[in-house]
Regions:
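Accessory terminal helices/loops
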Residues: 1-21, 134-141, 146-154, 159, ...
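Active-site metal-binding motif and surrounding structural segment of the metallo-beta-lactamase
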Residues: 24-25, 55, 66-116
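Conserved beta-strand hairpin/beta-sheet module of binuclear metal-dependent hydrolase folds
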Residues: 25-79, 201-213
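A short catalytic or substrate-binding loop motif that flags glycine-/basic-rich loops and adjacent residues
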Residues: 33-34, 42-44, 172-173, 181-182, ...
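Metallo-beta-lactamase
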Residues: 57, 66, 124-191, 235-240, 244, ...
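Active-site neighborhood of phospho(di)ester-bond hydrolases with catalytic His/Asp-centered motifs
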Residues: 60-62, 82-92, 117-119, 211-213, ...
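Short acidic, glycine/serine/threonine-rich loops at helix termini
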Residues: 97-101, 126-132, 221-224, 262-266
Length: 285
């Protein structure tokens, strides 16, 4: 079994290479693992990836509402540097709900608050969540209620408001691409539609690494259900093809395990693309 003490890369390599689907793949431990020089991940329901630079930390995603403080505590077990920037890969609550804890941590330490970055469609999502708060609470309880009751993951909109008041608004948004340069590191943020219309992913060309958010999640791609807003399986598949064309050799997802090695990346991203293309094609036939 792939228990929390096993390094996530070791678990992923064994699963992909053997074809044996050991569980769990999404380990909600709030523990930090060092993945590479100056790179770590906190495994939560939605992970937080952290890049250490000479100018501070760059994070991808903030974790969920209930566990933002746990995620921050894990980050602080590794580095006391200020958090320079935090990228929202998209606006789902399990990715943005913990952002208030990051802002509070900066205030407690006397640091400048992180700069929050997102795709330009994300603020409209936040506004929609506020306008339709009760409805979002209801549909997420239907989707995740059983999960929440078993594991207390806090992903079902269980507070008085679906989007908490302390969730940080993005300070800067982009449309297609944005270059993030921090402390000698360059990450290109790219937009593609997939599970959401506001999805961003990060491309670290120097290390051939992609921070993929929910484009990869170690489950069948969540291409939609009747109670959710439109999702984009054809564009999602195209994003997988784009990553492969760029030469990605490392995939760092928001759910599940890191995928390291070009052959493994080709297998996983190729399978996701083919599954989505098949799903869309057969549905439209």
């Amino acid at each position: 079994m792939s228990g929390p003490s096993m390094h996530p890369v070791d678990v992923a390599n064994r699963v992909i290479d053997s074809g044996v689907a050991e569980a769990p793949h999404n380990r909600v431990t709030h523990q930090l693992s060092v993945i590479d020089d100056d790179l770590a991940v906190v495994e939560s329901f939605s992970h937080c990836w952290i890049i250490r630079t000479d100018e501070g930390l760059v994070c991808f995603d903030a974790g969920g509402v209930r566990h933002g403080a746990d995620v921050v505590a894990a980050v602080r077990s590794w580095s006391d540097q200020p958090i320079h920037s935090l990228v929202y890969t998209h606006g789902h609550l399990d990715h943005v709900g913990g952002s208030g804890a990051f802002v509070a941590d900066a205030a407690d330490r006397g640091h400048t608050a992180p700069r929050f970055l997102a795709h330009e469609a994300l603020p409209a999502r936040f506004e929609r969540y506020r306008t339709t708060s009760d409805w979002n609470v209801m549909i997420n309880r239907r989707q995740f209620g059983g999960v929440r009751n078993r594991q207390d993951l806090g992903i079902a909109g269980n507070g008085p408001k679906f989007l908490p008041d302390d969730v940080a608004e993005p300070d800067e948004v982009f449309r297609d691409k944005m270059t993030l340069e921090v402390g000698g590191r360059t990450i290109q943020l790219r937009h593609a539609r997939g599970e959401t219309d506001d999805h961003a992913w990060g491309w670290d060309a120097e290390n051939r690494a992609a921070f993929t958010g929910d484009f990869t999640s170690w489950v069948f791609p969540n291409a939609g259900n009747p109670q959710k807003v439109q999702r984009y399986p054809i564009e999602w598949a195209a994003a997988m093809r784009e990553m492969l064309a760029l030469g990605v050799e490392r995939v760092y997802p928001a759910h599940g395990l890191p995928i390291v090695g070009r052959q493994r990346v080709e297998a996983v991203l190729g399978d996701i693309a083919e599954a989505l293309e098949h799903l869309a094609g057969r549905t439209l036939e």
